[in-house]
């Protein structure tokens, strides 16, 4: 019987001035081994830390680890609210976007980089170098993963953007996150990639052929930029829409990327 487990970690964030939580998957054999690589996996716009079980990430990981198809690893799914994972406001608060939807603004990049990662490294038996630290995410979480990895290339060695919300321009519905065009460009994965000097990591991009956001276009452009820089990047267009079913149908492929 597999003895993996999921733990809930709650911290009082100084960056956001509120309590934040995350779920942490510990693989079978965690207590016996010395250290493990760590995958940070980011949820989408309407998700939270429960995304890890919502997409069966723990179940698929159990199966692949048991079959020796991937290396055992720690998986962390932090709650990032509906924030895009950026530093958008010194004051953490909820605001309405142009479509009257609630979004969260605050120092979310600082929260993840300066609080979540150090807390996980302190609590768990992680490999505390970039070679043993990976980041990925789906939809808005894919956007979070890409910009955090590109802006902090010294921290991560594998990066995954799965149906990532990579836009070709600042859309009206996203203007509540960004004060002006310059703020958008600061976090736009395509813009960052053009200026990036670090090339020592592996990147996995994918989107559905019927993705309602057309994010396969951004993935193609980003992949071409990365490959021109000599970065080991792969881009896939699989069958499907922009939904949870697409993620669940491809999660095994993602884990084979992170785990090998």
Label each region the model flagged.
Residues 1-260:
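Non-catalytic cap/lid and distal C-terminal segments of serine-dependent acyl enzymes
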